[in-house]
Design a protein with these regions (language model features):
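Conserved GNAT acetyl-CoA-binding A-motif
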Residues: 69, 97-107
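Short coil/loop residues immediately preceding or within conserved phosphate-binding loops
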Residues: 45-46, 71
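Conserved beta-hairpin
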Residues: 46-59
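A short, internal acetyl-CoA/4′-phosphopantetheine-binding micro-motif in the GNAT/acyltransferase core
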Residues: 73-83
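Short amphipathic alpha-helix that is part of the acyltransferase structural core
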Residues: 1-35
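Conserved acetyl-CoA-binding loop-helix of GNAT-fold acetyltransferases
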Residues: 82-96
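Short loop/turn motifs at secondary-structure junctions and domain boundaries
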Residues: 39-44
Length: 107
């Protein structure tokens, strides 16, 4: 199940950080996605898409949008990859943000 948010609750933030740490340790990466919407051109636009499976956060899409050229980061738990989660998150992002003036998306 995917949930779209314009802000993360403290619990969601904690879950997101745990998922990010897990993915970074597995992938050997260090870049943290932006976990706030403070700089987004529209603070009401969904900036976080959370994919839950059996109550566990296993996928996360974040949106950094300080202008109409937005940056997206997608993380999926290593044990849940190759199951279409990233694709589902991106499609949800496209649907939920279709009415906002986004000109381009980079990863």
């Amino acid at each position: 199940m995917i949930q779209a948010r314009n802000k993360l609750s403290q619990e969601e933030l904690s879950e997101a950080k745990k998922l990010i740490n897990c993915c970074q340790a597995y992938d050997g990466t260090y870049r943290d996605p932006y976990l706030s919407n403070m700089l987004n051109f529209n603070p009401d636009m969904p900036a976080f898409f959370l994919y839950y499976e059996k109550g566990e956060l296993v996928g996360l899409l974040t949106v950094y949008a300080d202008d109409q050229d937005v940056e997206v980061a997608i993380l999926v738990h290593p044990n849940h990859r190759r199951q279409g989660i990233a694709r589902a998150l991106y499609r949800s992002f496209e649907k939920e943000t279709a009415s906002y003036p986004i000109e381009s998306v980079t990863f």
